[in-house]
Curated annotation (Swiss-Prot):
PANTHER family: MITOCHONDRIAL DISTRIBUTION REGULATOR MISATO, PROTEIN MISATO HOMOLOG 1. Disulfide bonds: none annotated. It comes from the Eukaryota. This is Protein DML1. InterPro entries: Beta-tubulin_BS, DML1/Misato, DML1/Misato_tubulin, Misato_II_tubulin-like, Tubulin/FtsZ_GTPase_sf. The keyword Protein transport does not apply. It comes from Gibberella zeae (strain ATCC MYA-4620 / CBS 123657 / FGSC 9075 / NRRL 31084 / PH-1) (Wheat head blight fungus). SUPFAM superfamilies: Tubulin nucleotide-binding domain-like. Its main location: mitochondrion. Signal peptide: none annotated. GO terms for biological process: mitochondrion organization.
Length: 497
């Protein structure tokens, strides 16, 4: 067994993870003649329902604010036992019950429950991530935080410090990691690692940073992969943009000290209308694009071992990126196509690494031209590599990297990415297709130096003086790790903060 326990924190993270779990559910096979390429025990846990029937549910811990779960109930059909009547002797007076009007399940959920043809999902009828979820969750997976309300205008959950303070308060009362996470970890025979979905441009970045710091006390050597999601900026005020920038700076600096690998993901600000038909105001749409990349990049960690597929593990993937031991931050790119042999001009290419400020494609191209690659992981799903893909330093499966050398690991799988009825139709070139060919590239390279230094400079003028030195030093140390030929005695480091 090589189990992965997943942590989901926040609304956009839960949208993204819902797409992830829908994809995992689609890989189940129900015929003895049909063998799955996926080892379902990696992400799913066996159990017993209230009626004694066997269940197989996601091994995940989910957090969201009050109102964030939509119509999803903590007790579902698999665990719904008859409630016992309360002993009347406890209270002899008259009882008054106040109930909030329950949220009506989406038409899609109602059709799934009825076993009928699924209703069509649109941006207008997907109100919550639970509206398009195709899986059941264990009651212990669902944790609602009542101190803040989703989309509140009076007290929005939007500052990094609010997240750290909320975690500190709740942890004093309950010991969150022990209450919520440990039961899932203790079920594992040989835990492969922890996968974290979180936003990094709001208060969830602070909450997650504190949560992982607590986890590190109990799991000091466990591999932790953190997917740091960022919401589209859209038409928000300058003050809100600056707040998100500061949150991102704090989150990256803190998460990189607690995680084995941190991968920030944000949609490019450039127009993608020629290849992607997307409503950026819809988290159902934006999360779908990021989920496809995450699900593909981590595919080797759940492939069936011993099959013709190239199985990997989270620690091997992390080791291939963090070549020098101090490079936890990685960038992510994705290429999606209708067919295996699709030419380059028909592929949909997305660069998710948008840390700091808006970068033009021309500027990114200049950085990429001169970059030195420390580690790179290419994951192909029924897609032929293009001729210019990096071959230098390529490692065969199972081969260990050598410190100081460029490392390139490639994984190939015939398993295409499923385009389910719960997945939005955002790829015009794939209209009518039930699946897609895909490639992701995870990379640690020298272009990250300038990105982090820019983030450091821009955030320094926006944070209080008492935070500036620690944040600046942390980001400077992180940037230096990606400078080709850097050594601890270098005098090139700037000390302007």
């Amino acid at each position: 067994m090589r189990e992965i326990v997943t942590l989901q924190l926040g609304q956009l993270s839960n949208y993204t993870a819902t797409h992830f779990w829908n994809a995992q559910e689609s890989y189940f096979t129900y015929s003895s003649d049909e063998k799955s390429l996926i080892d379902h025990n990696v992400h799913w846990r066996a159990g017993l329902g209230a009626d004694g029937s066997e269940t197989f549910l996601p091994r995940t811990v989910i957090y969201d604010l009050k109102g964030g779960f939509g119509s999803l109930r903590k007790i579902n059909a698999l665990y719904e036992a008859e409630s016992e009547s309360a002993p009347e002797a406890l209270w002899s007076g008259q009882s008054v019950v106040h109930k909030q009007t329950p949220i009506t399940p989406s038409e899609y959920q109602q059709s799934l429950d009825a076993g009928s043809e699924p209703a069509q999902l649109t941006t207008s009828n997907v109100r919550y991530w639970s509206d398009f979820s195709r899986v059941y969750f264990h009651p212990k997976s669902l944790n609602q935080l009542y101190d803040f309300e989703l989309n509140s205008t009076t007290m929005p959950f939007e500052r990094f410090s609010m997240g750290t303070e909320l975690f500190s308060m709740l942890d004093r009362e309950h010991d969150l990691a022990d209450r919520d996470f440990r039961p899932f970890a203790e079920e594992c025979d040989r835990m492969q690692g922890i996968q974290v979905f979180t936003t990094i441009d709001d208060a969830w970045g602070g909450f997650t940073s504190s949560y992982l710091e607590s986890l590190r006390d109990d799991f000091p050597k466990t591999t932790i992969w953190t997917w740091g999601l960022q919401s589209p900026l859209l038409d928000i005020s300058r003050a809100k943009r600056q707040l998100r920038l500061v949150n991102t700076a704090h989150s990256i600096e803190q998460l990189c000290t607690q995680s084995t690998t941190v991968v920030p993901l944000a949609l490019p600000e450039e127009d993608m209308t020629t290849s992607v038909s997307m409503d950026r105001r819809s988290p159902w749409h934006t999360s779908a694009l990021m989920a496809a990349a995450i699900e593909t990049a981590t595919l080797p960690s759940r492939l069936t071992q011993g099959s013709s597929e190239q199985a990997g593990s989270l620690d091997v993937l992390a080791e291939s990126l963090n070549v020098n031991g101090n490079q936890p931050l990685a960038s992510m790119r994705m290429s999606l196509a209708p067919a295996k042999d699709s030419p380059e001009d028909s592929r949909i290419n997305v660069d998710f690494f948008q840390v700091g400020r808006v970068w033009s494609r021309q500027h990114v191209a200049r950085l990429d031209t001169h970059k030195h690659v420390f580690g790179e992981i290419l994951s192909y799903r029924d897609l032929d590599p293009l001729g210019h893909d990096n071959e230098n330093g390529h490692l065969a499966p199972g081969e260990r990297p050598i410190i100081g050398n460029s490392i390139v690991r490639k994984y190939d799988s015939a398993l295409r990415f499923p385009l389910l009825d719960a997945y939005p139709q955002i790829y015009p070139q794939l209209a009518g297709n039930s699946d897609a060919s895909l490639q992701t590239t995870l990379s640690t390279n020298s272009s990250i130096v300038q990105r982090i230094r820019t983030l450091r400079t821009e955030s320094a003028r926006l944070v209080p003086v008492n935070e500036r030195e620690d944040l600046g030093n942390g980001l400077a140390d992180l940037a230096d790790a990606y400078q080709e030929g850097w050594f601890s005695g270098s005098d090139e480091d700037d000390d302007d903060l």
